[in-house]
Amino acid sequence: IANSWNGVLISLTAHASGTTLASQLLGETAAHEMGHQLGLFHTTESGGTVFDILTDTAECLNSTKDFDRNGKMSAEECEGYGAQNVMFWRPWTPASRSAGKKQETLSSHQQQVLKYSPIAK
Protein backbone atom coordinates (compact mmCIF):
# COMPACT_ATOMS: atom_id res chain seq x y z
CA ILE A 1 0.00 0.00 0.00
CA ALA A 2 1.58 3.23 -1.11
CA ASN A 3 1.90 6.08 1.35
CA SER A 4 4.53 8.57 2.45
CA TRP A 5 6.01 6.08 4.95
CA ASN A 6 6.86 3.25 2.56
CA GLY A 7 10.43 2.80 1.50
CA VAL A 8 13.72 1.03 1.99
CA LEU A 9 16.90 2.45 3.49
CA ILE A 10 20.24 0.68 3.11
CA SER A 11 23.44 1.82 4.79
CA LEU A 12 26.35 2.19 2.39
CA THR A 13 28.83 2.18 5.28
CA ALA A 14 27.66 -1.33 6.24
CA HIS A 15 28.58 -2.45 2.72
CA ALA A 16 32.00 -0.84 2.52
CA SER A 17 35.50 -1.49 3.74
CA GLY A 18 37.50 1.71 3.61
CA THR A 19 36.85 3.16 0.18
CA THR A 20 35.80 -0.17 -1.37
CA LEU A 21 32.08 -0.83 -1.79
CA ALA A 22 30.94 -4.47 -1.73
CA SER A 23 28.66 -4.06 -4.73
CA GLN A 24 27.51 -7.71 -4.91
CA LEU A 25 26.50 -7.66 -1.24
CA LEU A 26 24.82 -4.26 -1.69
CA GLY A 27 22.81 -5.61 -4.62
CA GLU A 28 21.77 -8.68 -2.66
CA THR A 29 20.77 -6.51 0.31
CA ALA A 30 18.72 -4.22 -1.94
CA ALA A 31 16.95 -7.22 -3.50
CA HIS A 32 16.31 -8.69 -0.03
CA GLU A 33 14.86 -5.48 1.39
CA MET A 34 12.73 -4.86 -1.69
CA GLY A 35 11.50 -8.45 -1.33
CA HIS A 36 10.17 -7.52 2.11
CA GLN A 37 8.58 -4.38 0.66
CA LEU A 38 6.83 -6.49 -1.99
CA GLY A 39 5.53 -9.15 0.40
CA LEU A 40 8.26 -11.75 0.96
CA PHE A 41 9.39 -13.06 4.33
CA HIS A 42 12.64 -14.70 5.44
CA THR A 43 12.74 -18.30 4.25
CA THR A 44 14.28 -19.28 7.60
CA GLU A 45 14.36 -16.96 10.60
CA SER A 46 17.50 -16.60 12.71
CA GLY A 47 16.69 -19.37 15.17
CA GLY A 48 15.87 -21.99 12.56
CA THR A 49 12.43 -22.73 14.00
CA VAL A 50 10.24 -20.26 12.05
CA PHE A 51 9.88 -20.33 8.26
CA ASP A 52 7.91 -18.57 5.54
CA ILE A 53 4.59 -20.11 4.47
CA LEU A 54 5.65 -20.89 0.90
CA THR A 55 5.86 -24.62 0.22
CA ASP A 56 8.72 -24.44 -2.27
CA THR A 57 11.31 -22.57 -0.19
CA ALA A 58 13.93 -24.53 1.70
CA GLU A 59 13.88 -24.68 5.49
CA CYS A 60 17.07 -24.80 7.53
CA LEU A 61 16.15 -26.57 10.76
CA ASN A 62 17.96 -25.63 13.96
CA SER A 63 17.70 -29.20 15.23
CA THR A 64 19.80 -30.57 12.37
CA LYS A 65 21.91 -27.65 11.05
CA ASP A 66 23.02 -25.50 14.02
CA PHE A 67 26.47 -27.07 14.04
CA ASP A 68 28.05 -24.48 16.36
CA ARG A 69 25.01 -24.66 18.69
CA ASN A 70 24.77 -20.87 19.05
CA GLY A 71 21.03 -20.78 18.31
CA LYS A 72 21.51 -18.76 15.10
CA MET A 73 21.43 -20.24 11.63
CA SER A 74 24.30 -18.97 9.46
CA ALA A 75 24.39 -19.09 5.68
CA GLU A 76 27.31 -21.50 5.96
CA GLU A 77 25.31 -23.90 8.15
CA CYS A 78 22.37 -23.68 5.75
CA GLU A 79 24.22 -24.20 2.47
CA GLY A 80 21.91 -26.30 0.34
CA TYR A 81 19.01 -25.55 2.71
CA GLY A 82 18.04 -22.07 1.59
CA ALA A 83 21.14 -19.95 2.18
CA GLN A 84 21.39 -19.16 -1.54
CA ASN A 85 17.91 -17.59 -1.50
CA VAL A 86 17.61 -13.79 -1.66
CA MET A 87 15.34 -13.91 1.40
CA PHE A 88 17.58 -15.94 3.73
CA TRP A 89 17.90 -13.98 6.96
CA ARG A 90 21.71 -13.65 7.05
CA PRO A 91 24.34 -12.98 4.34
CA TRP A 92 27.36 -15.18 3.70
CA THR A 93 30.52 -14.38 5.66
CA PRO A 94 33.25 -12.45 3.80
CA ALA A 95 35.27 -15.68 3.44
CA SER A 96 32.34 -17.48 1.79
CA ARG A 97 31.64 -14.45 -0.40
CA SER A 98 35.28 -14.49 -1.52
CA ALA A 99 34.78 -18.14 -2.47
CA GLY A 100 31.91 -17.12 -4.76
CA LYS A 101 28.87 -17.75 -2.53
CA LYS A 102 25.87 -15.57 -3.46
CA GLN A 103 22.25 -15.08 -2.48
CA GLU A 104 20.55 -14.64 -5.83
CA THR A 105 17.79 -17.25 -6.07
CA LEU A 106 14.02 -16.99 -5.70
CA SER A 107 11.60 -19.93 -5.68
CA SER A 108 8.68 -20.14 -8.10
CA HIS A 109 6.24 -19.22 -5.33
CA GLN A 110 8.36 -16.23 -4.31
CA GLN A 111 8.34 -15.08 -7.93
CA GLN A 112 4.54 -15.36 -7.92
CA VAL A 113 4.30 -13.22 -4.76
CA LEU A 114 6.42 -10.55 -6.43
CA LYS A 115 4.45 -10.75 -9.67
CA TYR A 116 1.13 -10.20 -7.91
CA SER A 117 2.25 -7.67 -5.30
CA PRO A 118 -0.05 -4.63 -5.43
CA ILE A 119 2.97 -2.35 -5.05
CA ALA A 120 4.62 -3.86 -8.14
CA LYS A 121 1.66 -3.09 -10.41
Where are these regions (language model features)?
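Active-site scaffold of zinc-dependent metalloenzymes
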Residues: 1-22
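Extracytoplasmic/secreted envelope proteins and their assembly/folding machinery
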Residues: 7, 28-31, 111
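Bulky hydrophobic/aromatic "packing anchor" residues in well-ordered structure
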Residues: 10, 87-88, 114
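The catalytic-center signature of Zn2+-dependent metalloproteases
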Residues: 20-106
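A recurrent domain-boundary module in secreted/ectodomain proteins
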Residues: 98-121
